[in-house]
Amino acid sequence: MPTAQPMQEAEGRRLTHYRIFNEVLNGRNVELLPQLCTQDYVYHGPGGLELEGIDQLRGMIEGYFTAFPDMHMEVEQRVVEGNLISTRWRVTGTHDGPLDGIEPTGRKIDIGGQVIMRFEGTKVAEEWEFFDELAMLKQVGAITE
């Protein structure tokens, strides 16, 4: 039978996961990131994107908030294994702000992706995120078939 400490940490990781999706992303509250991520946080994203530290993570998230002011993320599936949480998600939004040099088009996006979060204690230390950037660029009208 698991001891109280690992069970408390497991529940803490689930709560952190919930807070990232619901309070940080959907609630637009990046000020919570230091409570939820380690100081030496690392992000591995599509196209070889590598971010180090909470400030770089905050910058990326705020960039998406600017590009898609009505952005909403939905957790479709979550799998917990030890200090890892894997999440299949879907994001929707309207391209009403600049996105990496792409002027706003007013077009809607609806794309799926997956993120694997590695925890140290109850804080996220590292993430690997995968989503179809090509589909997003097509949906905002930045590229055509």
Model-derived features with residue positions:
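C-terminal and inter-domain tail/linker signature
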Residues: 1-145
